[in-house]
């Protein structure tokens, strides 16, 4: 085990440093407060041997919250995902702590978008899935901490980065690809608006207004962004809490 320390420059810089310091051909990611179950690395290695050439190898995972541990909605089939962008619309396929990426893939598409503080995982997955297939195992071998993910600052600070979801838009790509880019960008805009980033959220509304599949999310961002800033955080917090309770009950 090698411990590397550096000044806090964000999660993307930390991941990129870890990738640079690592020596293996397959790089597994594990965020703070998340955990692996016994057999996770063995399953990743097994998939890499059975389905070579994929850009991401992921397993199913559990969501850990204040009120327990619950299985995330994920595919039930093991193997290469037919269409990552379509199949990710209503269920999880890849999250960092339940995934591994071949070193050669990072060398081809680049590392995580340094300076991006919201949506950096989806940005990375989009870049990879655009060029490579994704492999998935339905075995729940990782645990994602929803508690830790809710600890981010409630005050919006504009990102200082050259990366954005706008650059991922491709008019020549299949509709499913651009729709997924819009979904990721509008989901980020919802968080930004809730934190008070009115102008940046409005920019996302204008740019990604082309979406047909995620009109509901688009309207949600528009409505939230039109409200007084002091209302937005509590309102989206209440909405997310209710949505989580409904999802847990399978409604």
List PLM regions with ranges.
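TPR repeat positional signature
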Residues: 185-186
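Membrane-interface aromatic/basic loop that binds lipid-linked glycans or pyrophosphate carriers
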Residues: 197-251
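Generic macromolecular interface patches on structured domains
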Residues: 54, 135-138, 178, 199, ...
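Catalytic core of nucleotide-sugar-dependent glycosyltransferases
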Residues: 81-83, 87-88, 140-148, 152-179, ...
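Conserved small-residue packing positions in alpha-helical repeats and bundles
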Residues: 189-192
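Nucleotide-sugar donor-binding/catalytic module of glycosyltransferases
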Residues: 1-158
């Amino acid at each position: 085990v090698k411990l590397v320390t550096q000044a806090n420059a964000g999660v993307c810089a930390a991941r990129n440093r870890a990738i640079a310091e690592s020596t293996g051909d397959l790089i597994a990611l594990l965020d703070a407060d998340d955990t692996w179950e016994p057999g996770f690395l063995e399953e990743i290695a097994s998939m890499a041997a059975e389905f070579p050439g994929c850009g991401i190898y992921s397993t199913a995972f559990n969501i850990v919250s204040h009120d327990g541990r619950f299985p995330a909605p994920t595919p039930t089939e093991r193997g290469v995902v037919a269409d990552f962008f379509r199949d990710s619309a209503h269920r999880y396929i890849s999250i960092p702590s339940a995934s591994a990426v071949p070193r050669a893939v990072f060398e081809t598409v680049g590392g995580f978008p340094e300076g991006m503080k919201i949506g950096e995982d989806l940005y990375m997955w989009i870049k990879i899935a655009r060029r490579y297939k994704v492999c998935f195992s339905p075995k729940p071998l990782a645990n994602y901490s929803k508690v830790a993910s809710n600890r981010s600052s409630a005050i919006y600070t504009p990102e200082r980065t050259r990366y954005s979801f706008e650059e991922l838009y491709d008019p020549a790509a299949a509709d499913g690809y651009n729709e997924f880019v819009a979904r990721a960008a509008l989901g980020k805009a919802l968080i930004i608006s809730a934190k008070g980033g009115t102008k940046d959220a409005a920019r996302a509304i204008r740019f990604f207004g082309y979406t047909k599949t995620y009109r509901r999310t688009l309207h949600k961002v528009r409505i939230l962004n039109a409200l007084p800033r002091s209302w937005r955080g509590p309102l989206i917090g209440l909405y997310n809490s209710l949505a989580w309770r409904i999802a847990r009950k399978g409604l």
